[in-house]
Amino acid sequence: MAPNVFGLATKATGLAKAKSLSSRAYVTFLAGNGDYWKGVVGLVKGLRKAKSAYPLVVACLPDVPEEHRRILINQGCIVREIEPVYPPHNQTQFAMAYYVINYSKLRIWEFVEYSKMIYLDGDIQVFDNIDHLFDLPDGYFYAVMDCFCEKTWSHTPQYKVGYCQQCPDKVQWTEDLGPKPSLYFNAGMFVYEPSLSTYDDLLKTLKVTPPTPFAEQDFLNMYFRDVYKPIPNDYNLVLAMLWRHPENVDLEKVKVVHYCAAGSKPWRYTGKEENMDREDIKMLIKKWWDIYDDESLDYKNSNVVMNAVDGEVEAQKIMEALSEAGVVHYITAPSAAS
């Protein structure tokens, strides 16, 4: 089970000797001309504060403005343009209208210059180093189990009977309801291995898979069901856990916070939406802003030193040297048949 597999990584110290720095990276996704770039800036600064040894790649759609791309590059991100991926028949009412564009996330399986990547949504903040997750055994898909208790899940049988995998003994799944649902992860954070063959198969499977309310999250859960390994909630705290399953949350141990609840995006926060006036929410919003506003974490001002395989590598100096040499630029991924 997952705890044993997970333990193999948590016991690792430093970087695996056989892995080079360049073979691993974090990756996020950005689309449109809105304000989500602020979340990505906060994310890369959070990774920097946590002294991550790996870069953040931003997979952005063509509609991301040049101005926003430049901001991200100036913060040390690697900006990589991708083409959109759409479901075959857009006839489904998605839980949120903007979910349909998230199928484009599938493009990150094309990033085969990296042997392993950790995907993080742009509304996530990393408060502690999670580089050890790269040392999890290959061949599996690692992510945190989701919570079924919010109204966005009202279309599901789990929600209708009050069942949640975060507390499966509270309301049990009885035989008369049919087969027990498979474990279901939140796709805002996951550990995966890029692969062109996997990417091609993802697209082929997508063509014959009817869209569902949670778009690419449902699709990824279906596709990786047999190789999914849960990791602790500390690696992707969905804010609803604070009021739905507080017994499962220890904020002092949480490493990654996912600001996905309505009204919780720190850069848009007003405190007026339901549950947003909670003291724990206010604290987490402040923690995000403390990182975002910290000028010492800006890329040009960063003195972060990363532990490499044999010694220390200064991330800032390397990236600046690459930039001066003209190596850091937009990378356009090859188009694939849709």
Curated annotation (Swiss-Prot):
GO BP field? galactose metabolic process
Q: Which Pfam families match?
A: Glyco_transf_8
Q: Which residues form the active site?
A: K105
Molecular functions (GO terms): glycosyltransferase activity; inositol 3-alpha-galactosyltransferase activity; metal ion binding
Q: Which cofactor does it need?
A: a divalent metal cation
Q: Write out the entry's keywords from A to Z.
A: Carbohydrate metabolism, Cytoplasm, Galactose metabolism, Glycosyltransferase, Manganese, Metal-binding, Transferase
Q: Where does Mn(2+) bind?
A: D121, D123, H258
Compartments, as annotated in UniProt: Cytoplasm
GO CC annotation, single: cytoplasm
Q: State the family it belongs to.
A: Belongs to the glycosyltransferase 8 family. Galactosyltransferase subfamily.
UniProt xrefs under PANTHER family: GLYCOGENIN SUBFAMILY MEMBER (PTHR11183)
Quote the protein name from its UniProt record. Answer: Galactinol synthase 2
